């Protein structure tokens, strides 16, 4: 009996001695299982709005800023398919009901823990003006994803894009996804991209540095700028985007070609007519994924 007690006493001493090490090993294994084997959590909900906290604001100009909103966990992702957008909602003084508008983040699911919105504040823009009133720590109501466009690698051979002003945001999302998935980066996307980007003044060209960096590193992406009020010595287009510019700088109509449009309504309307006159399939009032001319 005494031998049994002695043996158990020795065993207890061993357990006490090595217990901290066992706890540490278990903790490490648990952490590995949580961070190494689990997929990032997608937080968007298409059926209900959720509140996200503004964590950072970066002013780009007097009326343009990038708003960074935190996701609940640093490992969370928005869960937004490439080509889709989100709805923002706010109660605005003087409006009879909640105002809802669509925006495309300039960040992607490759960046965890937050999402970025590039917003230009228009005098008549309810949501854009509302965003300028937000302070760090304030919340914004967001729902999604939504939209008919879901980009997949090599869905067509060549994409032509026409963007005006903040209409560059869905284009940038797709451009970055294509370049990120090039063969040299371990992917398989060989889609060519040509972009016509229209603005009023040269200083209005949003995300210009990022766009030109992408064009410099990728020979499958080209940009043609168009300005209403070009400065002296400007070597891009001037005035409004014309059918002649589209013919010169975008891919010709073909089954494996898609044209994407996003910008102010008058511009999009004019571009629908211009593309149709050049032989592209007539754009529908509400675009579908399979359309040759797709309007965001």
From Swiss-Prot:
The chain crosses the membrane at residues 11-31. PROSITE patterns: FAD_FR (PS51384). Pathway: Protein modification; peptidyl-diphthamide biosynthesis. It is found in: Mitochondrion outer membrane. The keyword Nucleus does not apply. The keyword tRNA-binding does not apply. Its EC number is 1.6.2.2. Gene3D superfamilies: Nucleotide-binding domain of ferredoxin-NADP reductase (FNR) module, Translation factors. It catalyses: 2 Fe(III)-[cytochrome b5] + NADH = 2 Fe(II)-[cytochrome b5] + NAD(+) + H(+); 2 Fe(3+)-[Dph3] + NADH = 2 Fe(2+)-[Dph3] + NAD(+) + H(+). FAD binds at residues 132-147, 158-195. Pfam families: FAD_binding_6, NAD_binding_1. Coiled coil: none annotated. It is a single-pass membrane protein. Belongs to the flavoprotein pyridine nucleotide cytochrome reductase family. NADH-dependent reductase for dph3 and cytochrome b5. Required for the first step of diphthamide biosynthesis, a post-translational modification of histidine which occurs in elongation factor 2. Dph1 and dph2 transfer a 3-amino-3-carboxypropyl (ACP) group from S-adenosyl-L-methionine (SAM) to a histidine residue, the reaction is assisted by a reduction system comprising dph3 and a NADH-dependent reductase, predominantly cbr1. By reducing dph3, also involved in the formation of the tRNA wobble base modification mcm5s 2U (5-methoxycarbonylmethyl-2-thiouridine), mediated by the elongator complex. Monomer. Component of the 2-(3-amino-3-carboxypropyl)histidine synthase complex composed of dph1, dph2, dph3 and a NADH-dependent reductase, predominantly cbr1. PANTHER family: NADH-CYTOCHROME B5 REDUCTASE, NADH-CYTOCHROME B5 REDUCTASE-LIKE. This is NADH-cytochrome b5 reductase 1. It comes from Aspergillus terreus (strain NIH 2624 / FGSC A1156).
């Amino acid at each position: 009996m005494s031998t049994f007690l002695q043996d158990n006493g020795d065993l207890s001493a061993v357990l006490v001695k090595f217990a901290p090490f066992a706890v540490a090993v278990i903790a490490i294994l648990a952490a590995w299982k949580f961070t190494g084997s689990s997929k990032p959590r997608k937080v968007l909900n298409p059926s209900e709005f959720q509140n996200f906290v503004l964590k950072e604001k970066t002013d780009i100009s007097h009326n343009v800023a990038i708003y960074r909103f935190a996701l609940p966990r640093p490992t969370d992702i928005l869960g937004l398919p490439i080509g889709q957008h989100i709805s923002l909602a706010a109660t605005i003084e003087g409006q009879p009901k909640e105002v809802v508008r669509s925006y495309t983040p300039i960040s992607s699911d490759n960046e965890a823990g937050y999402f970025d919105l590039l917003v230009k504040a228009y005098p008549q823009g309810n949501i854009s003006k509302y965003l300028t009133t937000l302070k760090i720590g304030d919340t914004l109501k967001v729902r999604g994803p939504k939209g008919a466009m879901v980009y997949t690698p090599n869905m067509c051979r060549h994409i032509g894009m026409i963007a005006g002003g903040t209409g560059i945001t869905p284009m940038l999302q797709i451009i970055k996804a294509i370049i990120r998935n090039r063969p040299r980066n371990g992917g398989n996307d060989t889609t060519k991209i040509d972009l016509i980007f229209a603005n009023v003044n040269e200083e209005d060209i949003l995300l210009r540095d990022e766009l030109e960096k992408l064009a410099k590193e990728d020979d499958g992406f080209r940009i043609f700028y168009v300005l209403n009020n070009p400065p002296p010595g400007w070597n891009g287009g001037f005035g409004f985007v014309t059918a002649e510019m589209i013919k010169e700088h975008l891919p010709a109509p073909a089954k494996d070609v898609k044209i994407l449009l996003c910008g102010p309504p008058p511009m999009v309307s004019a571009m629908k007519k211009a593309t149709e006159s050049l032989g592209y399939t007539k754009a529908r009032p509400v675009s579908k994924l399979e359309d040759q001319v797709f309007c965001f």
